Amino acid sequence: MSKHQKKEVEVEFEKDDPKAVYLELFDKDTELKSLSDEIEKLTGEKDLELMKCDKDIYKSAEPLYRERRALLLEIPDFWATIFTNLFLKLGFVDELTMCVDDFFVEDTETEFRLFIDFRENDIISNKQVIITVTTPTTSEELSQEVKISTTPIELKQNKTETEKKNKDSKKSTDDEDEDEDDDEISGFLKFLLNPTKDIATFIVGSVWSNPIDSFCNDDDEDYDGLIASDSEGEEDK
């Protein structure tokens, strides 16, 4: 075979599935597989560099975000309205969202943090909840699971007692109702107790970047992907 002659690879595939053709080719040709791996590696490095640029831009703009924060606080129930709209679109009517008093996002080289402040309420004792989401620092970490942590949530006594009564009453029902225990805590409170990457990144990427649109309910299209993702997550449980 001459140096310039193309290697022939025997492939069986469905004509109406072009993606299968490429997958089959990469599986059977080690040179193509090596090339694919190299491209994937470069793509990861590119994504990491873009993320670093985004962080640098945010750091430069943070003083402006803080200035904006003070102005937004002058609008009555601004963040409470935004979080209520968000979880309504996810299918939850949640009293706790109306108790959000302030909100801010900080971004560092290794993580971003959501600071959610609360006014006095009958559900949780926390005055502030901080949700921390780690961000990759190497291209290898891009494919790893994101670590998310949250402030321990202190449920008020009446909330705890109500949940306990609900659980006790459900113990006497059929086994098929056992899954309902997971639904006792839902919506915003569930997110605070067990935050998800999809909702956290959506809040930062869409809500935080354009809060006026969210306040005026002019961001319906932004929610489409989040609603689909949240629905898939519920089905997988």
UniProtKB/Swiss-Prot annotation:
Residues 156-173 have a biased composition (Basic and acidic residues). InterPro entries: NAP-like_sf (IPR037231), NAP_family (IPR002164). One of its GO terms (cellular component) is chromatin. Disulfide bonds: none annotated. Transmembrane segments: none annotated. Residues 141-182, 214-237 are annotated as: Disordered. One of its GO terms (molecular function) is chromatin binding. GO terms for biological process: nucleosome assembly. Residues 141-152 have a biased composition (Polar residues). Belongs to the nucleosome assembly protein (NAP) family. This is Protein set homolog. It comes from Dictyostelium discoideum. The lineage of its organism: Eukaryota, Amoebozoa, Evosea, Eumycetozoa, Dictyostelia.
